[in-house]
């Protein structure tokens, strides 16, 4: 079952990807979504106000290239509209938005704490990188890094997440590959393993 909003978002994205511009229907659908949500229907103002260099969203990228501001705003509209419906990961896979993590790790960051927010807390807040630290230190940047607060730990996520090309597709089970072979030999199977995944269990 499709939500009407998702069908409209799909049309908007497909229209823009195909034509490089929004047709009258795509613009109308976008304004309808925003009107129903109680948000300004001036999509051109939203697009003009977007600075991609300030966006930390994975949706800014297709592969390792930044998309343009209109396509990004369509993606952001999708993210907001389908919030908490379990679609975001599939969208990011569809757009190949994790490619930059193949060559460089991504470190999750939270709130901008070290500009001014820290002033609202006790002066003795522990941020020294030890096991007693409650937040990541200022030397790591202004934004809190939840997995980097304890620099003494062997936490594998401390230095960030990485991604592998294989993760864009799920592996096919070896038993399924064998089942599709008359002699149960994976080399004679009608089903092939997805790229970058092994054929041994």
Where are these regions (language model features)?
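Acidic/polar-rich alpha-helix caps and helix-coil junctions
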Residues: 1-201
């Amino acid at each position: 079952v499709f939500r009407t909003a998702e069908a409209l978002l799909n049309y908007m994205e497909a229209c823009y990807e195909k034509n490089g511009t929004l047709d009258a229907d795509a613009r109308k659908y976008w304004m309808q979504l925003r009107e129903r949500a109680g948000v300004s229907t001036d999509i051109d103002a939203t697009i003009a106000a977007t600075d991609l260099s300030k966006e930390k969203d994975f949706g800014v990228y297709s592969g390792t290239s930044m998309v343009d501001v209109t396509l990004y705003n369509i993606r952001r509209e999708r993210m907001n509209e389908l919030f908490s419906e379990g679609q975001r990961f599939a969208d990011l896979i569809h757009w190949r938005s994790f490619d930059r993590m193949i060559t460089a790790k991504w470190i999750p960051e939270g709130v901008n704490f070290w500009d001014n927010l820290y002033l609202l807390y006790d002066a003795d807040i522990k941020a020294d990188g030890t096991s007693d630290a409650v937040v990541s230190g200022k030397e790591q940047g202004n934004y809190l890094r939840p997995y980097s607060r304890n620099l003494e730990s062997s936490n594998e996520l401390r230095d960030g997440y990485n991604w592998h090309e294989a993760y864009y597709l799920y592996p096919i089970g070896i038993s399924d590959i064998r089942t599709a072979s008359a002699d149960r030999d994976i080399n004679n199977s009608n089903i092939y393993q997805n790229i970058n995944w092994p054929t041994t269990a």
